């Protein structure tokens, strides 16, 4: 009887895990780039750390309640991984915050990371291109369903934004579905 109870608990845990996985897979984002390139250059993590302002992105479920002020802050942890703090302002003025952890996957370039905001579940975070002075960055992942354009300045100006769009197009991304972030 005891082994039957253990089997039942095991099946319940497996079913719950399958349900959580299915929930993440239900919403399929359109592919904005069918052949995501490898990151263009190495990343100096010390220079990449700090606050980044989201300039534009592809639509994602986890940012839909964000109406303005989207930032990502990265800081180094003692174990070599990276703290990730994503913040945004909702329409009611409240702040939404997500705390995560990133680990470097490719130590030769530091451009490929895995990021988790939910326990053992990690997603790809590829720094596809960045300015030599680290004033901007273009981030994606291998499926082509996610894209972020980031800047060190909250309002980098129209010329800088158009340059980011041009660079994303050069990486093969369809920039028509971009959502431009208001940084009030």
Give residue spans per PLM region.
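A beta-rich soluble binding module of mature secreted/lumenal proteins
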Residues: 2-184
